[in-house]
C-alpha cells in the first residue's frame, strides 16, 4: 500500500469520527432547544416575581449552552470540509497512480507478447529451415543412390532371384566384428535366422560387390551396426545407401543397432537414422538384441 493510500484511509476514518461527533452534538443541541422553549413558556406562566426570576435564569443558562453547541457544530463542519478537500485531492492522486499502473502493466504485457511473438517466429523459421535441410538431404541421397553403379559388373534380376532368400543382411565395419558383430551373427543363426554375413556368405573367388548386391536384394531386413568405425568407412555407407533404396521401394526394412555411439553422433552421420527406433549395445546384451530381432522377423 502506498503512502497516499494510507493517507486516504486515515482521512476517511477521521471524517467518519467527526460526523459521529457532529451527530451527538446535534442531538444535544435539539435537547437544549426543547428545554429553552419549555423555560420560555414557564416565564409566561410565572405568577410571582421569584418564580419569574428563576425561569429567566434557567433560560439564560440554556441560551449559553445553545451558543456553545452551535459553535461546536460549526467547528466540526469546518474540520469535515477541510478533510473532505484533502480526501478529494488524495483520491485524484490515487486515480492518477492507478492510471499509470494500468499503463505500465499494459506496456509490460505488450512487451511480453512481442517477445513471445518473436520467439514463435524464430521457432517457425528454424522449423522451416530444418524441413528444407531434410528435403535437401533426401534429394541429395536420392541423387547419390541413382548415381551409384556396380564396379564389378551389373547385378541382374536373375542374380537376385537366384540368390537364396535371407532374413537379415548385416552391414558393419570390420573393426566391430570381434567385440560384437561376430557374436550377433552366430547368435542369430543359432536362433534360426537366415543371415547374410560376409564370413558366412562370401567364398573364395566371389565378386565382393556382386555378392553384397545379392545379399541386399534377397534380405527382408537390413541390420546396420552404427559405430564410430562405421561412420569412417566408405564401403559400409554404400551398403547403407543400398538399404535406404530398398526400404524406400518397400523391399527391405532397416534395423539400426547403436554400438558405443550417442544419438548426437548418429544424427551427425545421418539425421534419418537418428529418428529410427534402434537397439543399443550399451543397454542390451547380444542375446537380448537377438531375441528382439527374432520377434520382429517372425512377426
Swiss-Prot record:
The keyword Transferase does not apply. GO terms for biological process: NAD catabolic process; signal transduction. It catalyses: NAD(+) + H2O = ADP-D-ribose + nicotinamide + H(+). Gene3D superfamilies: Toll/interleukin-1 receptor homology (TIR) domain. InterPro entries: TIR_dom, Toll_tir_struct_dom_sf. Residues 164-297 form the TIR domain. The keyword Lipid metabolism does not apply. It is an enzyme of class 3 (hydrolase). The active site is at residue 239. Its EC number is 3.2.2.6. GO terms for molecular function: NAD+ nucleosidase activity; NAD+ nucleosidase activity, cyclic ADP-ribose generating. NAD(+) binds at residues 173-174, 203. Pfam families: TIR_2 (PF13676). Keywords: Hydrolase, NAD. The TIR domain mediates NAD(+) hydrolase (NADase) activity. Self-association of TIR domains is required for NADase activity. Homodimer. Interacts with host MYD88. NAD(+) hydrolase (NADase) that catalyzes cleavage of NAD(+) into ADP-D-ribose (ADPR) and nicotinamide. This is NAD(+) hydrolase PdTIR.
